[in-house]
């Protein structure tokens, strides 16, 4: 995959807003020192790495129910 697009990631995440949240959380983990879950031989930025991980199905999410007020 030479270029990552939102459409590549939306195959794994149904909602683009959820995709933004998932990618941003993964970027924070990478900045804090987490190892990439994909091969990163190039000098890719953490945002690109996180999107590639999501598109490859290496990063997922679980929705929890909201608390009632």
Curated annotation (Swiss-Prot):
Domain of life: Bacteria
The keyword Nucleotidyltransferase is assigned to this record: yes
Keywords for this protein: DNA-directed RNA polymerase, Nucleotidyltransferase, Transcription, Transferase
UniProt-listed Pfam families: RNA_pol_Rpb6
The gene coding this protein: rpoZ
Record's function text: Promotes RNA polymerase assembly. Latches the N- and C-terminal regions of the beta' subunit thereby facilitating its interaction with the beta and alpha subunits.
UniProt protein name: DNA-directed RNA polymerase subunit omega
UniProt organism field: Geobacter sulfurreducens (strain ATCC 51573 / DSM 12127 / PCA)
Family: Belongs to the RNA polymerase subunit omega family.
Catalytic class of the enzyme: transferase
One annotated Gene Ontology cellular component of this protein: cytosolic DNA-directed RNA polymerase complex
EC number: 2.7.7.6
Gene Ontology molecular function, alphabetical: bacterial-type RNA polymerase core enzyme binding; DNA binding; DNA-directed RNA polymerase activity
UniProt-listed GO biological process terms: DNA-templated transcription initiation
Keyword set includes Ribonucleoprotein: no
Catalytic activities: RNA(n) + a ribonucleoside 5'-triphosphate = RNA(n+1) + diphosphate
Subunit: The RNAP catalytic core consists of 2 alpha, 1 beta, 1 beta' and 1 omega subunit. When a sigma factor is associated with the core the holoenzyme is formed, which can initiate transcription.
């Amino acid at each position: 995959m030479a270029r990552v697009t939102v459409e590549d990631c939306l195959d794994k995440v149904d909602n683009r807003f959820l995709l933004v949240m998932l990618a941003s959380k993964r970027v924070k983990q990478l900045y804090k020192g987490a190892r990439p879950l994909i091969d990163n031989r190039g000098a890719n930025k953490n945002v690109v790495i996180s999107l590639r991980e999501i598109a490859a199905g290496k990063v997922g999410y679980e929705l929890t129910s909201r608390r009632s007020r």
